[in-house]
UniProtKB/Swiss-Prot annotation:
Name of the protein described by the UniProt record: Ribosomal RNA small subunit methyltransferase A
Reaction(s) catalysed (UniProt annotation): adenosine(1518)/adenosine(1519) in 16S rRNA + 4 S-adenosyl-L-methionine = N(6)-dimethyladenosine(1518)/N(6)-dimethyladenosine(1519) in 16S rRNA + 4 S-adenosyl-L-homocysteine + 4 H(+)
Functional summary from the UniProt entry: Specifically dimethylates two adjacent adenosines (A1518 and A1519) in the loop of a conserved hairpin near the 3'-end of 16S rRNA in the 30S particle. May play a critical role in biogenesis of 30S subunits.
Annotated coiled-coil segments of the chain: none
Native source species: Paraburkholderia phymatum (strain DSM 17167 / CIP 108236 / LMG 21445 / STM815)
GO cellular component, one term: cytosol
PANTHER family according to UniProt: DIMETHYLADENOSINE TRANSFERASE, DIMETHYLADENOSINE TRANSFERASE-RELATED
Pfam families noted in UniProt: RrnaAD (PF00398)
EC number, as in UniProt: 2.1.1.182
Length: 276
């Protein structure tokens, strides 16, 4: 099979710049919908609907003209096809998910009302996950298809090689569970990596520790900036302002050995020292 034909599905050429790999395995699609459990009238948005493989069963289960499924899509060629296929049961938002205001779909009030799903483009998955975290207070849950390596980092425990900045920053915000493995042959064109389905449920505001998330991000970024070095080196800039001994924080460790709660404690101490 030629490279061009392998990238074509239903008359559409998958675009590398959009990270397009279309899900075609009906069994996997059914399994994904089963774990999402969409209900009629729910407020849901799909990121990157593509050719509508997941969109179709979601529309069937939850959409009405008064409460359509929402979708964010960047590829204009696909938008026309999706509009024609789903009509007023799908409300399309043309644009880049990295810049989209997901809070605008959550409705009035401050309670979580939005469910987010999608086969996320692997080339932007980490920045997109961080962008989505800014709307976590309005979100009920998220179900995503991602590169398996990314999912393993999301659910990694301290002490493992997969534990990373991504692990800390997302586990601070969400309860995260890996649900399903998805092989490359489930897609057209097949990606060069394995994939997985992950569920993310945001903690309620009262469950989150009081911490400046910008400070937390700075501390975690510094800690993981040189993974093989001890924290006494990577966090050296904080040693004048933070009493690590009083915190019970052992600097004779590497970044991947520190639980999320301890990073939060350091960030809180940094804020206290700065009077913020």
């Amino acid at each position: 099979m030629s490279n061009s034909s392998s990238r074509q599905h239903q008359g559409h050429f998958a675009r590398k710049r959009f990270g397009q790999n279309f899900l075609v395995d009906l069994g996997i699609i059914d399994s994904i919908v089963d774990v999402i459990r969409p209900q009629r009238g729910e407020r849901m948005v799909e990121i990157g609907p593509g050719l509508g493989a997941l969109t179709e069963p979601l529309v069937e289960r939850l959409a009405t003209p008064e409460a359509p499924l929402h979708a964010v899509e960047l590829d204009r060629d696909l938008i026309g096809r999706l509009k024609k296929k789903f009509g007023n049961l799908l409300e399309l938002h043309e644009g880049d998910a990295l810049a989209f205001d997901f809070g605008s779909l959550a409705g009035e009030g401050d309670k979580p009302t939005l469910r987010i799903v999608g086969n996320l483009p692997y080339n932007i998955s980490s920045p997109l996950l961080f962008h989505l975290a800014t709307f976590a207070e309005r979100v009920i849950d998220q179900h995503f298809m991602l590169q398996n390596e990314v999912v393993e980092r999301m659910v990694a425990e301290p002490g493992s090689k997969a534990f990373s900045r991504l692990s800390v920053m997302l586990q601070y915000r969400y309860v995260i569970d890996k649900l399903l493995d998805v092989p490359p042959e489930s897609f057209q064109p097949p990606p060069k990596v394995d994939s997985a389905i992950v569920r993310m449920i945001p903690y309620a505001p009262h469950e989150l520790p009081a911490v400046d998330e910008i400070k937390l991000g700075e501390v975690v970024t510094a800690a993981f900036s040189q993974r093989r070095k001890m924290l006494r080196n990577t966090l050296s800039t904080y040693r004048d302002s933070v009493d690590f001994e009083a915190l019970g924080f052992d600097l004779q460790r590497r970044a991947e050995d520190v639980p999320v709660a301890e990073y939060v404690a350091v960030a809180q101490a940094v804020s206290a020292a700065a009077g913020t």
